[in-house]
Amino acid sequence: MCDNSCFCENKQDTIDESLDKTCIFCTIAKGDDRYTEILAEDEDFVCFRDINPGAPHHYLVIPKKHIYSCLSLYADDISLVRGMAEMGRNVLKANNVTDLKDISLGFHVPPYITVPHLHLHVLAPYSQLYKWAINKFRTNWYINEEKTVEILMKGKTQMV
């Protein structure tokens, strides 16, 4: 189990171009999935609703380039994490979420990911997680935005 403070030299490629054709999140990022409504998009990221929401508001923010997971993040990816979080907060505001202190923005740590493409969970209100989701989003296998940035700011090569 990860204690959210460890680092290792995980050799998984950050970007794997071969997955573009088979990764559902790459398909969504390209706008090629007719079943997914894009809620926000910019040059680097897209945001859409989670198909299995764990809270009244549950969105996913993904980078357009294929990045495996939070294990693939390096110290120079802090701006990527912050950009994803900013988009998530903006989507919450656009959906009339006003209490930004009762939210959670975070990543699941492999092996507890369902899609091998980096995705930031945006949950609100965090105090109203659905019963089935409580253990999924309140665990050491779920690392919030602040902790992710804190670990990356330590200047380690790669985060776990």
Curated annotation (Swiss-Prot):
Catalytic activity, EC: 3.9.1.-
Domain HIT: residue ranges: 24-132
Residues forming the catalytic site: 119
EC supergroup of this enzyme: hydrolase
Coiled coil: none
Major localization class: cytoplasm
Enzymatic reactions: adenosine 5'-phosphoramidate + H2O = AMP + NH4(+)
Annotated keywords: Cytoplasm, Hydrolase, Nucleotide-binding, Nucleus
Positions with a binding annotation for AMP: 50-51, 119-121
Compartments where found: Cytoplasm; Nucleus
Short sequence motif Histidine triad motif: positions: 117-121
Pfam families: DcpS_C (PF11969)
InterPro entries per the UniProt record, alphabetical: HIT-like, HIT-like_sf
GO cellular component: cytoplasm; nucleus
PROSITE patterns with a match to the protein in the record: HIT_2
GO MF assignments: adenosine 5'-monophosphoramidase activity; nucleotide binding
Subunit note: Forms dimers to octamers and even larger oligomer.
Family listed: Belongs to the HINT family.
Functional summary from the UniProt entry: Exhibits adenosine 5'-monophosphoramidase activity, hydrolyzing purine nucleotide phosphoramidates with a single phosphate group such as adenosine 5'monophosphoramidate (AMP-NH2) to yield AMP and NH2. Hydrolyzes lysyl-AMP (AMP-N-epsilon-(N-alpha-acetyl lysine methyl ester)) generated by lysine tRNA ligase.
The name this protein goes by in its record: Adenosine 5'-monophosphoramidase HINT3
Protein species of origin: Danio rerio (Zebrafish)
Upper lineage: Eukaryota, Metazoa, Chordata, Craniata, Vertebrata
Gene that produces this protein: hint3
